[in-house]
Structure formats: C-alpha cells, structure tokens
Amino acid sequence: LTFDTFLGPSGDKVTVNDKTTTSDVSIESELQKIEEKAAAMQEDLSSGELAQQEMNTLSLQLYQLWDNELNSIWSRLKETLDEDTMTTLTQEERDWIKTKDSAVEEAGKDAEGGSLQPLLENDKAAELARNRVYELAEYLK
C-alpha cells in the first residue's frame, strides 16, 4: 500500500491510503487497516476537543480516506472484471454517485450556510463511501 501523510487538525500525522500497489494484501486486511484509521479519526471527531473548523477538516479527511479506497477498488475492478460486468457496474456507479450527491446535500440542509454544514455533509459522504467500498469489495473476493 502507498500512503499520503499530512498533518491533521490537532497537528498529528494522518496517513490516508492512496492506492494499493501490491496484490498480495487481502481485501479483508486492507479494509481492516482502513477501518482502524477511520476509527481513530472518528474518535478524534467525537472527543469534544476540536474546534468546528478542525472537525470540518477532519471529517473531510475521513471522507477522503473512504473515497480513496473506493477509487482504489474501482481501479482493480476495471482490471479484473469482464467487460459486460464492468459496463453494468459502471452504470450502477453513476447511479450511486447521483444518489450519494443528493443524500449529502440533504444531510447539510438543516445547517445550510452554517459552520456545521460541512461536517454534516462530510459525515454522510464518508458513511456512503464506506458502504460502497464494502459493496464493491465483494467483487474482489
């Protein structure tokens, strides 16, 4: 695995999975590592110690963690699935993106224009991306 490292809101180093570069890592162990990173980020979000802007930034990083994993899995699916399956899956993915975008927008409506809006939207995006990661990972098992 390759990782991007950057400083999180509290100054701690945060490492985000960028893409998988070795095929000997099982999808289960790969997802376990992502879950561990996500849990640490979620713990920081729930700590009550971060300012709103820090929470917004960290929630975006949590979404990016899952979105990067989703993109990594998608790249591998393009290499391994037959053309018909990939065509069907591509249409499903387009539909999923529309649904996700609507759900994310809806999640932020109650706080529209406020400092809480990004947190609500990022949390929903992370939740949906995580769920989609697990759906797509089934094709790699």
PLM-predicted stretches and their roles:
Residues 2-141:
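N-terminal alpha-helical modules
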